[in-house]
């Protein structure tokens, strides 16, 4: 009531902060207990005359449970995510984690670009849940207009930016709005409403994906610099489906920065599972691309596979060598 009397346009209930609050029974201590979050939100809604947003913690097994609790209590919207429990580093001389307070430390709240994938996942989960059905303010690592567009495509109705503003100042908001406007124009979209939520239903459970879909890595030798990072990644961390061959054997040119006779990577497409690791470690843009390979196989999900196995319609697929 005091916030409304002071002229606030709305209230955001902090049920997400993981440090300095939860130790006192507030912040994430509330957001981690849906029943408690529902009760406190209900108390606020009894008196609220302005919109109330419930800010949720990511430090929870299933964030939709807390989102549903906010919905049941009558909240006008939810926001997510707050920061993630973390320890940034340890001083290897004193053996005290940083930051240090009189020789001791505590966990902090991790934020910024690194938490964006976690935020997108939890945003989509809430946006897709029919029992939530609330406006969502998206938070977590938004730094560019592309980040903003991704949050909106996954259902965010508004966005909040903190870390990027701390780094670059409020001028970054102008860059984001300019970029979003240019993007919308390029796609023929009239407003953000045309973008909002377009990706929500594109995310499905793993069991609903096509097991017979096949992609392989292709190397553009005109761009390859011969660093062979893709070979190392595949050999030591993936499926050992990249060989080193001489340029003469492959009948390819030297490419930028390469020297004669130095081996270059060659993908054995029959063994490639399309994990994408090679393209991620490659330092050259679009040198390695993932290409869909038609294999003539009918679409089959994991559920289809299990049903056909149970009916004796097919044999078990052997594991990949």
Where does each model-flagged region fall?
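Short Fe-S-cluster ligation motifs
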Residues: 253-280, 284-285, 306-321
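Alpha/beta enzyme core
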Residues: 1-137, 143-161, 205, 211-212, ...
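Short low-complexity, flexible loop/linker segments enriched in glycine and/or proline
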Residues: 26-28, 92-96, 173-177, 258-260, ...
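Iron-sulfur cluster-binding cysteine motifs and their immediate structural context
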Residues: 229-254, 259-260, 277-296
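Residue-level marker for beta-strand->alpha-helix junctions and adjacent short loops that shape enzyme
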Residues: 18, 59, 85-86, 166, ...
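Alpha/beta catalytic cores of nucleotide-metabolism and tRNA/nucleoside-modifying enzymes
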Residues: 110-133, 143-222, 239, 287-289, ...
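Flanking scaffold residues of small Cys/His-coordinated metal-binding clusters
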Residues: 216-229, 267-277
């Amino acid at each position: 009531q005091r916030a409304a009397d002071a002229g606030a346009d709305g209230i955001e209930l902090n049920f997400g902060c993981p440090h300095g609050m939860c130790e006192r029974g507030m912040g994430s201590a509330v957001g981690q207990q849906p029943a408690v979050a529902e009760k406190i939100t209900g108390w606020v809604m009894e008196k609220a005359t302005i919109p109330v947003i419930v800010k949720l913690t990511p430090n929870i097994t299933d964030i939709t449970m807390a989102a549903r609790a906010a919905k049941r209590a009558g909240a006008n919207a939810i926001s997510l995510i707050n920061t993630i429990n973390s320890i940034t580093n340890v001083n290897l001389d004193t053996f005290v984690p940083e930051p240090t307070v009189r020789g001791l430390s505590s966990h902090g709240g991790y934020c910024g670009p690194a938490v964006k994938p976690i935020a997108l996942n939890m945003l989509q989960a809430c946006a897709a849940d029919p029992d939530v059905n609330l406006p969502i303010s998206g938070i977590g690592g938004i730094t560019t207009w592309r980040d903003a567009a991704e949050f909106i495509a996954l259902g965010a109705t508004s966005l909040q930016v903190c870390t990027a503003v701390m780094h670059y100042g409020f001028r970054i908001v102008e860059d984001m709005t300019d970029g979003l406007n240019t993007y919308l124009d390029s796609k023929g979209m009239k407003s953000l409403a045309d973008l909002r939520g377009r990706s929500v239903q594109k995310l499905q459970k793993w069991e609903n994906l096509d097991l017979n879909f096949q992609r392989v890595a292709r190397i553009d030798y005109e761009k390859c610099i011969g660093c062979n990072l893709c070979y190392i990644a595949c050999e030591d961390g993936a499926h050992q489906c990249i060989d080193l061959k001489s340029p003469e054997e492959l009948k390819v040119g030297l490419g930028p920065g390469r020297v004669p006779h130095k081996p270059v990577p060659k993908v054995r497409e029959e063994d490639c599972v399309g994990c994408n690791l090679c393209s991620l470690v490659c330092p050259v843009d679009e040198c390695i691309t993932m290409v869909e390979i038609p294999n003539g196989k009918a679409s089959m999900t994991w559920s289809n596979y299990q049903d056909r196995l149970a009916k004796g319609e097919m044999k078990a697929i052997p594991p990949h060598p």
